[in-house]
Each structure stands twice: as structure tokens, then as C-alpha cells.
């Protein structure tokens, strides 16, 4: 069980169990390859890497997954989905995602736990490398470089008007 606080300071106790994993699958949908919604299965070993990758780039998905996992606790606190999600932003999303990832490792049966832990560690390393590269590229930018103008340049006096010029042969 992992604890984190939302942006309102409310504490949440997250435990990934078969019941909470089933709630996530039943309550959260993501776009499938065909564009149609498909259940988000956080603990399916075949798609775990893809699921974690989706969570790491979608704060709203993190909030929805946490809501589904914590639904009984949310209800016990007299909150609805909107109130819960209103408390999920910034650092609380980061804390919730960290708790969720740690719970995925704990949830996984022992014989596969090392594999899941290694997967998450490798994803952390890759994300750090990619982030450092993006920061390096941003710092290497020069003012005005790569900025596309949306306006046309001012008309030049040497640009001829439409139609034949004085040097054009007569028809």
C-alpha cells in the first residue's frame, strides 16, 4: 500500500489488488488501434510497457486511473469523480503515478516482479535521457531560429504589378 496526497492535501492510500485492477479496466478506456475505445488494463503483462508509457505522458489518464483504483475510498470521503479529479494536478499527479507504479511492481507475482521492476527502471533511464536531450536542444536554440512567419513580406518597389511589363513584346 502506498500513500500520497492530492493538491488539496487529502491523503490517499493506494493498494493495487485484483479488485482495483478490475475497476480500472472497467472504468477507464483508451483509444484502440482502430480508434474505438478499449479498456485500459494496467496489469496485463503483454501490454504493461505500453500502459505505463501512456500513463507517463497523459496526466488526465493518471487521474482517471487513480480515481478508478481509489473509487471506494473516494466515495467513503463523500467525494465524487469531479471533486477527486479537481485535486489531481502537478506534484500530486507525480506522487500518484509513483505510487501506482510501485503498486504495479508489488501486485505482480514474484516470478515476474523482477521483470516488471526492470522495465520501469529502464523506462526511467530512457525518459531521463530523452528529457536531457530535449533540454539540450532548447538551450541550443537561438532567438528567431526555426520560427515560421505567418505574414508575407512587405511589397518591394521593384516588384512589377500584375500584367505585362514595359519590356514585354506587344501582342
Task: Tell me what each language-model feature is.
Residues 16, 57-58:
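A generic short alpha-helical patch detector that favors 3-5-residue windows
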Residues 1-20:
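Short, extreme N-terminal segment that most often corresponds to the first beta-strand
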Residues 22-28:
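Covalent nucleotidyltransferase core used to form phosphodiester bonds in nucleic acids
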Residues 1-7, 26, 33-54, 60, ...:
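Charged interaction scaffolds used for protein-protein
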Residues 13, 54-55:
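Generic alpha-helical structural element
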Amino acid at each position: 500500500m502506498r500513500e500520497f496526497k492530492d493538491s488539496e492535501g487529502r491523503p490517499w492510500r493506494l493498494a493495487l489488488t485484483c479488485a482495483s485492477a478490475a475497476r480500472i479496466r472497467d472504468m477507464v478506456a483508451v483509444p484502440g488501434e482502430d480508434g474505438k475505445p478499449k479498456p485500459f488494463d494496467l496489469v496485463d503483462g503483454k501490454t504493461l510497457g505500453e500502459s505505463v508509457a501512456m500513463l507517463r505522458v497523459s496526466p488526465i489518464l493518471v487521474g482517471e486511473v487513480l480515481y478508478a483504483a481509489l473509487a471506494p475510498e473516494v466515495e467513503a470521503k463523500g467525494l465524487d469523480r469531479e471533486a477527486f479529479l479537481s485535486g489531481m494536478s502537478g506534484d500530486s499527479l507525480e506522487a500518484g503515478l509513483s505510487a501506482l507504479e510501485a503498486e504495479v511492481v508489488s501486485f505482480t507475482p514474484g516470478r515476474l516482479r523482477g521483470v516488471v521492476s526492470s522495465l520501469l527502471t529502464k523506462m526511467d533511464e530512457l525518459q531521463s535521457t530523452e528529457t536531457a536531450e530535449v533540454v539540450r536542444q532548447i538551450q541550443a536554440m537561438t532567438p528567431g531560429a526555426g520560427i515560421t512567419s505567418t505574414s508575407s513580406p512587405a511589397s518591394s518597389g521593384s516588384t512589377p504589378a500584375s500584367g505585362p511589363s514595359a519590356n514585354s513584346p506587344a501582342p
